Regions:
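N-terminal strand-loop element at the rim of the active site
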Residues: 7-13, 28-75
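Carbohydrate-associated surface elements
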Residues: 150, 169
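A short helix/loop element that forms part of the nucleotide-sugar donor recognition site in Leloir-type
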Residues: 176-190
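Conserved donor-binding/catalytic core segment of Leloir-type glycosyltransferases
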Residues: 191-207, 213-216
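Nucleotide-activated donor-binding/catalytic signature segment of Leloir-type glycosyltransferases, i.e.
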Residues: 241-259
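Short alpha-helical donor nucleotide-sugar binding micro-motif in glycosyltransferases
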Residues: 258-259, 266-271
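Short hydrophobic beta-strand element within catalytic cores of glycosyltransferases
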Residues: 297-300
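Conserved acidic donor-binding segment of nucleotide-sugar-dependent glycosyltransferases
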Residues: 312-325, 334-340
Length: 380
């Protein structure tokens, strides 16, 4: 048994891909018999049915929104440094074998611990977030893992280290196919014969939802009985709402507040397909994999690590060039017109995720990267 800690100030205060990865890996490692600790900021976010082998420690921090805006990276570094100032003594007292860092902004952790601390550090990459000085600080990172092959190349280009690829995962028992929820559709005002596309995630520019709105207004989609459900919040939401009005799409686009991660499967049960038109390099795309695990066909951008999730052979979903509203509209029309194809793609996507991308598999790969014994046995 190993003592493993995850350090991420955001994991107890917000939802997102990195936060999901931390909680799910913590759960998989705890079920495998390891002693797990999670160090986050003061906040109440926890997964439902937290495994008893996981201890959560929270500490005060200065939220990035309260830091002078001289750059988002500066704000996030200050946010994490303020958390470390309060958390480091409790962390050092834990005598952990390994600590997992999720952002380069935390690379200073090995440098601020008491002399003689034996904890080794692993960087679990899910993107880039590089900053001046990170190469120097990275010298005390002992192990490197990445969310995809694409992400591994990004990390190697920056730090000249080759990470082990562990991939992210999906809770396939939770994100499972279900009977279409017409009650939820009725609550949303969606007719039974309407093809409902959906996106769930943070509304930031690089997610490309402006492209999805423009695709819906393309000639190929104007005479199709479709609607787009956008679930989430973020700085781009007002801009997207304004674009919806400008394009005359107010009757075809629904904005929904963010939902807890545990309620996402029910939401996917009400939709016909997922649309994820990223215009920035996503390392993996957990939300895409979750939709696929629910047997939903997906349309996503051919960018970053997304093709590793969806596959290139068009059996599980369709890949389109990033920032191409016309190509996205054609793909949406293709799925809207072919319900049988939607079913086939959904079933193939579910099989792909179950075969390649579960959290138990991710945990086994992480343990191997740390040089620890992997035990696939499920521990109650």
């Amino acid at each position: 048994m190993a003592r493993i800690a995850f350090i991420d100030v955001t994991v107890t205060v917000m939802y997102g891909g990195i936060q999901t990865a931390v909680w799910r890996l913590a759960d998989a490692l705890a079920r495998a018999g390891h002693e797990i600790a999670v160090f986050g900021g003061d906040g109440n976010i926890r997964p439902a049915n937290l495994h008893p082998g996981i201890t959560v420690h929270t500490f005060p921090f200065r939220a990035r929104e309260k830091v002078p805006d001289i750059g988002s990276r500066f704000q996030r570094i200050v946010e994490r440094a303020s958390h470390a100032r309060h958390a480091r003594h409790a962390f050092a007292a834990g005598n952990y074998d390994w600590a997992i860092l999720t952002k380069p902004f935390d690379f200073y952790w090995p440098w601020i611990l008491p002399k003689g601390c034996k904890t080794r550090f692993c960087f679990m990459s899910g993107g880039t977030d590089f900053f001046a000085g990170d190469r120097f600080l990275s010298r005390r990172v002992a192990a490197w893992v990445a969310a995809s092959q694409f992400n591994a190349w990004q990390i190697h280009a920056r730090y000249k280290r080759w990470p082990k690829v562990i991939y992210n995962g999906v809770e396939i028992d939770k994100f499972a196919p279900g009977v279409r929820d017409d009650t939820l559709r009725a609550h949303l005002g969606i007719a039974s014969n309407t093809v409902l596309f959906a996106f769930a995630g943070r509304l930031v520019g690089w997610k490309g939802m402006g492209v999805a709105l423009r695709a819906l207004a393309e000639p190929a989609m104007r005479d199709v009985n479709t609607k787009l459900l956008i679930v989430g919040d973020g700085p781009q939401k007002p801009e997207l709402q304004q674009l919806t009005q400008t394009l005359g799409l107010t009757q075809r686009v629904l904005f929904h507040d963010p939902v807890a991660h545990d309620t996402l499967p029910a939401l996917y049960g009400a939709v016909n397909a997922g649309v994820f038109p990223s215009i920035g390099d996503e390392a993996f795309g957990i939300t895409i994999a979750e939709a696929m695990s629910c047997s939903k066909p997906v349309i996503a951008s051919h960018i970053g690590g997304i093709p590793e999730v969806v596959g290139n052979e068009e059996s599980c979903g369709l890949l389109v060039p990033p920032n191409d509203a016309t190509a996205l509209a054609r793909a949406m029309r293709l799925l809207a017109d072919d319900p049988a194809r939607r079913v086939r793609m959904g079933e193939a996507g579910r099989a792909r995720i179950a075969r390649l991308y579960t959290w138990d598999l991710s945990a086994q790969r992480l343990l191997a990267a740390l040089g620890l014994k992997s035990d696939a046995t499920r521990v109650p």
